[in-house]
Amino acid sequence: MPTYETDGQISVSLEFEIGSVWIRATKRTDTVVEVRPTSAAKDADVKAAELTQVDFSGGRLTVKGPKQRTVFSSKKGSIDLTVELPAGSEVHADSPMADFVTEGPLGDCRIKTSMGRIQVDRAVGARLKTDMGDIRLGTVSGDAEVTGSGRIEVGAVGGRLTVKNSNGDTEIDEVHGVLTANASNGRIHIGLAEGDVEAKTANGHIRVGQVVRGKVGLQSGVGDIEVGIAEGTAAWLDVHSKFGAVRNALDTAAGPGEARETVEVRGATQVGSILIRRA
């Protein structure tokens, strides 16, 4: 189990083909790495763990697994990797088939896998991508980009958030910057949006619990649209449904009057109802 003295934040690079990763970031002065075979009874897993290289130099930790001819085979080795490191460290990881879980505050976090789930607790910035699997992102103080095919859950993002989901529901708690969310098949639910919003889905409902200001564009092929307008915000509306009811529960006015904020809402659905209400 390699242990390195690390007085401050470090950068981490992980490259391997099959397995799982657990990263724990805390206030500490060392970094501990453990590489284990996923199954100690499987020769391929044991060999993959033995051939995995771990190196630390110049504040950079590198973990590199052995190259395997093909990933999608029961004969290929799988490793379980655990890294305990200082809070605020950067993590960049790339694996064709792996699950990732992080706990504690990280710096910039970039994780990419073709097949596997990704769960990130906290980060300064995040870029997460899986071609097949769920993604859960907790809190990001800066910008975040999430691309997946499965269920996507995002907590709070302080900056810009971009989400692309090819098949699955998308749940976003709150975004304080610009939000762009696109889904081929699945619902998009947004709790609080304090900036511009652009959300599109070919099949699914779109719900925004509360918008405060800016421009909001919502589009669904088949699905309902619901938007809550914050108290003290005046709204300009341009909403249409080809086959469905449109209901505006706001009080009408000739202009914004003494409203503290203004929002422009454009919404369209081919099949579904639209509701605009106070949040």
Predicted regions and their residues:
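Intrinsically disordered, low-complexity terminal regions
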Residues: 1-279
